[in-house]
Each structure stands twice: as structure tokens, then as C-alpha cells.
Amino acid sequence: MSKDRDGRRTSRRGTLKKIGGFSLGALSFGAVGRTQAATGSSVTTADIAPPGPNGDPKSVQIDDKYTGAEMYGEGDFRVGLGTDLTMYPPVYRESLGNGSGGWEFDFTVCGSTACRFVDSNGDVKEDDKAKEMWWQEINFNDINQDLYSRNDSDWVGSTPADTQPEFDYTEFALARDGVTLALTALNPAMGSLALGATYFLSDMVNWIASQHEDDSSLKRKWDYDGLSGPLYADSSTYLLARDEMTSNSYESFTIDNIAVAFPEFPVRTKYYVTFTAPDDPSTQSISTLEEEGIYRVPATEVAAARPPGSRRSKSAADEMVYVADPKKFIEVEPVKNPSIPDRIYEEIEQKKKQRSRKQ
């Protein structure tokens, strides 16, 4: 992190987050607002995980659930949230850091929710949907390096929506796998509710309702509340993020995934995350790299793995790329039973007042 001429903190985030000529921080969307995709900024699997022996990501799933009374007196229902956090192998590229080299830590956060009525025993009735979803949000807090996301369809998506997707998430491996793993956490929380990834992905579109980011936080939010009230019983979100780090540095932050159902039922999953960027691999011996689990991939192999028109050009074929073992350089700790932030209850009350004024 550096300072500009006015003494303000600056970083590559301000440049990296530019989409189609405008900054993400200035954007605000309607309840079902479609984002604009940036030309030439798509992400390929080769960008996230170049070929090599360290290609297996590190994934952790957690869930939360709450059972309460349906807002119109139709009985009790349960809202469940399953979250998958998948960390991909750290990648070193000589082109980062204005040519001085640096590490990319890519990860996805996928959250799936379901609302179902329960019987007199408190067991979920699988086919009895409670259309009570209100909103979902993902928050990264305590950021101190160049952690960012984009608005492109292969960086963010959500279902439900009442429009057909312009991007086929069922064919996108990162979203498909992330939602599938999120469901492995959601299903036990919802009494082994039988839901498949395609159920969500076939309706997923590239949109967010609102967002915020500054030097220490990043937030994406999806509102599912229609003008006439709640319309959906299920929802799912997908978010890809990237942390660009200098060699021999570390980053610790938290990830929150929160879902809220009517009339006032929030559920929350939370992780503590630490990234440790290895030393500059170009200065290390082969034996040291092997000992630390770092593998060198010639960029010609990486370029060959990318489809035509991918974000990274083959003109960088002389760049050497290194891939590190995520198990050695990434720590993820799920937080047990995190409390609901006061701001969520405050927002619930504010939204209730807004709804009452409209009615």
C-alpha cells in the first residue's frame, strides 16, 4: 500500500476494480439490477489454477439454521444457510507488482439458502416451501492488502431472478463446484433436503443489488424482496475474489455470509482466513521450492490451457508462473455460532418501516 500526493492510501485495487470505465465503489443497483460485464476481463480456469501438481483447492463448508413462525400465521418454517469457501492454489506471476512479481490468492464464496415449513415434530417438509427469503450478503472485513472482486458474470452471480441468464453458470466449473459444496452444508441443516446444484445454477444470473468497498472491507448484497412481498423460498450466491500480495507477506481477514428471511430470521456463517505469501520463488533453489510445495509452470503451458480470447494474453509466454500448495500457505478457521450483528436487526427494523409506509 502506498500514498498519493494528497497523503491518501492508494493501491492496485483502485485500478483493478475499474469495470468498463467506472469504479465499482460508485455503483448501486436496483432490487434485480443486472451488472455490466467488462470486455476482455473474463476469468478462465487456467487463470485460477494453472496446470501443475498443486491444483487441488482447499474447501471448507459450514451452515446455520433458524426455525420460527411464518409472517402470515401459516405455521413454523426453517431457514437454512450453507456456505462453501474454496481457496485455490496461490499463483506467483512476474508481471504483478509493476513487474516486480507477486502472488495471487483466488477464492470463491458460495452460499445456498432454503426456507421450508416444518411439521409438528420440527422436521422439514421437503415439498412445502416457505417463500420468505429477504436478502443475502457477503462481507470481507479487516482487509489490508489488494483484495478485490469484479462485476463480471464469471466473478459474481445469484439466483433467483426473473430473467434468463446471459452466462451459463451450469458450465462454469468454479460456480458449479462451489454451489454443490455449499449444498453439502445446507442439506443436513435442512434435514437432508434434496437439492442439486443445477436447481440453482440454471436460474443464476449476473447481478447484485448493492455493494460497498473501501481500504478495509468489501461487501456484496442481493435483495430478493419483491414490491408485493417475499417471492422466493430458495437462493444461492456466487462470488469470486482475488488478493494480490507481495512476496513474504501475510493477510488476515474475516468472511461473513449472512442470509435473512421474513419476518426477522437472520442466519450467519463466518470464517477467519489467513494468507501467507511465500518468498519470491525466482530467488529460491529447486530443492527449497520442492520442500515448500511450490511448482514452476512455464507460461506456455498456462497459455495453452486457456481458450482463445481469455483475459491473459499469450504474449506473456515468456513469463514464469509458480503455483504453491494451498494447504501450506492458507489457513481457514470456521467460527462456531457467530452472533448476528446489531446492524442486521437495525436494517430489519428499517425495512419493516419502509414496507409499512408502502402498504
From Swiss-Prot:
The residues the entry assigns to the signal sequence are 1-46
What's one GO-annotated cellular component? extracellular region
| Region span, Disordered | 40-59, 340-359
Gene Ontology biological-process entries? defense response to bacterium; killing of cells of another organism
Q: Does the keyword Calcium apply?
A: no
Keyword set, alphabetical order: Antibiotic, Antimicrobial, Bacteriocin, Plasmid, Secreted, Signal
Q: According to its UniProt record, where is this protein located?
A: Secreted
**What protein name applies here?**
Halocin-H4
Q: What is its main location?
A: secreted
Job of this protein = Has antibacterial activity against other haloarchaeons. Interacts with the membrane of the target cells where it causes permeability changes that result in an ionic imbalance leading to cell lysis and death.
